[in-house]
């Protein structure tokens, strides 16, 4: 880790504007870090040094004339789910082999418009389906964190594992990510980084490979709360190309950092105390409550009674939407094509060879719950549960609660290739137990590092807010961050 790659976005921005450093110097420092570490961590599936240096030179020219954007010269990594013009975009799937789009996603275009520099594309679970980043066609991402005294390789979480690992290992200043059921917040918790899933509709989904369209939402993973606020402001926009984009301008989220939480009501849902929850997670939760209380917030018990139905309902809805969205990949116009004796055979062979096991599992499950005989019993019922979950949150917020504090993961990072989890996919799905409810309700949620477990691995806490009140999450998370401190992995790579 060099001195330059240790700078937060806020610190680097200051040094770039004051001309203490140049964008080219900063970019070269990150490219050097990637070259040294990516063989061990596997966070990047494509590195774009020529593009990065060209963008950095353009940033230096704008900085010299005083026309700098909000992210001028800041090197970022991009999750492989976001379309990047003429650059590898495969959602880490073999089915999209060789695909290079001729267009740019709205979110990444917003970042480039603000002067950010693209370092490359980041590894992820195939089509964003997974909680460990072991489902990538390009192999698993390795968490930069290790348990004290151990050399065992750990998962970084998923699906945005490459984004979280790259930020934690200082291989980018920040990263784009996406969250369908926890894919920003869970990897952030596993890697000691900050991740926010904004309100559904806050960031455009145009140009992002779809998994479950009514749940997917883009957001940033960053080193601290301030950096996450800076990134989200630039990522968010109103977009006519996305019918789910909300006609609301994003405020200056950074202005919320340092604001008082005095008088705020923080809800503690009793349903999040699940059977078998480790004592360390409960203790961390209690610590978070104490920090907020010390800062002047009021802690109140609340009930979200339909929480226990969220996980099965989520996997029904998400798989159903995935089976529909992924029907378009057939090997005809782009991506992998395996020849067959006729067109139907070609479809079957291309999809069988192109999709990994977890993606196939979810397509099959989604097709099943949408089939004529089971639609009412599963899909329709899951959508009704979704409405009830949303209503639970609405009632709590209507009663005066400003934000909700919960755990974000049931454990710290686990080993790559864990046999118990590999043998039972449902156990892996349980990693999303604390995160899926707010995707079902479309609410904003933020994961902030809050401590280390007995093995020296990071643990996070989750804050859930009212629709389009991300500022509340940023100011509340900053209080936790100030109390807990920041966490950096010891370099072994």
Curated annotation (Swiss-Prot):
GO terms for cellular component: glutamyl-tRNA(Gln) amidotransferase complex. Coiled coil: none annotated. Keywords: ATP-binding, Ligase, Nucleotide-binding, Protein biosynthesis. It is an enzyme of class 6 (ligase). One of its GO terms (biological process) is translation. It holds the Pfam family Amidase. It catalyses: L-glutamyl-tRNA(Gln) + L-glutamine + ATP + H2O = L-glutaminyl-tRNA(Gln) + L-glutamate + ADP + phosphate + H(+). One of its GO terms (molecular function) is ATP binding. InterPro entries: Amidase, Amidase_CS, Amidase_dom, AS_sf, GatA. It comes from the Bacteria. Its EC number is 6.3.5.7. Belongs to the amidase family. GatA subfamily. Heterotrimer of A, B and C subunits. This is Glutamyl-tRNA(Gln) amidotransferase subunit A. It comes from Allorhizobium ampelinum (strain ATCC BAA-846 / DSM 112012 / S4).
């Amino acid at each position: 880790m060099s001195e330059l790659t240790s700078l937060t976005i806020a610190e680097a921005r200051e040094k770039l504007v004051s001309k203490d450093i140049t964008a080219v110097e900063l970019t070269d420092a990150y490219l050097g870090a990637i070259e040294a570490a990516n063989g061990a961590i596997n966070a990047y599936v494509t590195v774009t040094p020529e593009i990065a240096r060209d963008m950095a030179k353009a940033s230096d020219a704008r900085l010299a004339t005083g026309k700098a954007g909000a992210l001028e010269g800041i090197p970022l990594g991009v999750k492989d789910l976001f379309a990047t013009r003429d650059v590898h975009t495969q959602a880490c799937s073999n089915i999209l082999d060789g695909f290079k789009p001729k267009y740019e996603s709205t979110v990444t275009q917003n970042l480039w418009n603000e002067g950010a520099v693209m370092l490359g594309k980041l590894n992820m679970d195939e089509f964003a389906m997974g909680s460990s980043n072991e489902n990538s066609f390009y192999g698993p991402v390795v968490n930069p964190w290790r348990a004290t005294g151990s050399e065992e390789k750990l998962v970084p979480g998923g699906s945005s594992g490459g984004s979280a690992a790259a930020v934690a290992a200082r291989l980018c200043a920040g990263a784009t990510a996406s969250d369908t059921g926890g894919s920003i917040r869970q990897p952030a918790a596993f890697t000691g980084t900050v991740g926010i899933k904004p309100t559904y509709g806050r960031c455009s989904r145009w140009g992002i490979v779809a998994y479950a369209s009514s749940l997917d939402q883009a957001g940033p993973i960053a080193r601290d709360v301030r950096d996450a606020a800076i990134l989200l402001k630039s990522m968010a926009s109103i977009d006519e190309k996305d019918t789910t984009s909300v006609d609301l301008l994003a405020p200056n989220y950074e202005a919320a950092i340092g604001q008082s939480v005095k008088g705020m009501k923080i809800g503690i849902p009793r349903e999040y105390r699940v059977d078998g929850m480790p004592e360390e997670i409960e203790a961390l939760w209690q610590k978070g409550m104490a920090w907020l209380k010390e800062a002047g917030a009021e802690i109140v018990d609340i009930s979200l009674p339909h929480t226990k139905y969220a996980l099965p309902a989520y996997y029904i809805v998400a798989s159903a939407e995935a089976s529909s969205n992924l029907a378009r990949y057939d090997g005809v116009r782009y991506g992998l094509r395996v020849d067959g004796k006729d067109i139907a055979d070609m479809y079957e062979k291309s999809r069988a060879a192109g999709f990994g096991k977890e993606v196939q599992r979810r397509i099959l499950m989604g097709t099943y719950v949408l089939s004529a005989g089971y639609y009412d019993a599963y899909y329709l019922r899951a959508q009704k549960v979704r409405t009830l979950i949303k209503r639970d949150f609405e009632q709590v917020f209507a009663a005066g609660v400003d934000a909700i504090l919960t755990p974000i993961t049931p454990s710290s990072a686990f080993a790559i290739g864990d046999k118990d989890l590999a043998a039972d996919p449902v156990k892996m799905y349980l990693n999303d137990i604390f995160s899926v409810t707010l995707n079902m309700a479309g609410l904003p949620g933020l994961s902030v590092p809050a401590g280390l477990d007995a093995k020296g691995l990071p643990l996070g806490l989750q804050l859930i807010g009212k629709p389009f009140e991300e500022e509340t999450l940023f100011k509340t998370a900053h209080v936790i961050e100030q109390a807990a401190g920041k966490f950096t992995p010891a370099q072994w790579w």
